């Protein structure tokens, strides 16, 4: 299978990319940083920039002719009281956690629709199910993604494309270090 995973520079994304690569799948990791691995190919991509997203998908399709799985893993956290959050930090968070994920899903759908197969997995959070204190905007960004995924699931099922959210708990990765 051809698998695209976003946010592969560290943590969950890197671990998934290595795992699937070791299993013999063709894995493309999209992240802002260029990561060296013998198990997957990195395409430096900022998923908040739709031009970069489209270029990465085109590059993959030139060599593989298909995309079987997209794992939308790229994301960031945000800590602080709602009242103390700045507009800039909120927009940065939603631009990555929601808009970037939507751009990725939109970019792979033409290929998945044409081949009448695909799986899109969005890494979400148990925080999407409730407003976590001092992580309200993070919870909101993941909740918004979940609702988009829920709608898209019904929009694309006719092409045998499955879309879901994976609700993870707190995992010790570098996302905690990079929270705004």
Predicted segment positions?
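N-terminal Rossmann NAD(P)H-binding glycine-rich loop of SDR-like oxidoreductase domains
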Residues: 9-13, 17
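The beta1-alpha1 cofactor-binding region of Rossmann-like NAD(H)/NADP(H)-dependent oxidoreductases
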Residues: 45-55, 87
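Residue(s) in the substrate-gating loop at a strand-loop-helix junction
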Residues: 125
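SDR active-site lid
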Residues: 158-180
């Amino acid at each position: 299978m051809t698998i695209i995973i976003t946010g592969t520079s560290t943590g969950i994304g890197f671990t998934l990319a290595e795992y699937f690569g070791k299993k013999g799948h063709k894995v493309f990791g999209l992240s802002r940083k260029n990561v060296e691995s013998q198990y997957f190919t990195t395409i430096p991509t900022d998923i908040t920039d739709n031009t970069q997203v489209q270029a990465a998908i085109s590059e993959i399709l030139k060599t593989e002719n298909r995309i079987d799985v997209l794992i939308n893993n790229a994301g960031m956290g945000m800590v602080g009281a709602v009242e103390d959050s700045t507009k800039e930090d909120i927009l940065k968070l939603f631009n990555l956690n929601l808009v970037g994920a939507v751009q990725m899903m939109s970019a792979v759908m033409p290929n998945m629709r044409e081949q009448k197969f695909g799986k899109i997995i969005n890494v979400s959070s148990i925080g999407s199910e409730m407003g976590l204190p001092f992580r309200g905007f993070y919870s909101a960004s993941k909740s918004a993604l979940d609702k988009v995924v829920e709608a898209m699931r019904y929009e694309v099922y006719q092409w045998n494309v499955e879309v879901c959210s994976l609700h993870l708990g707190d995992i010790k990765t570098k996302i905690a270090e990079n929270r705004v």
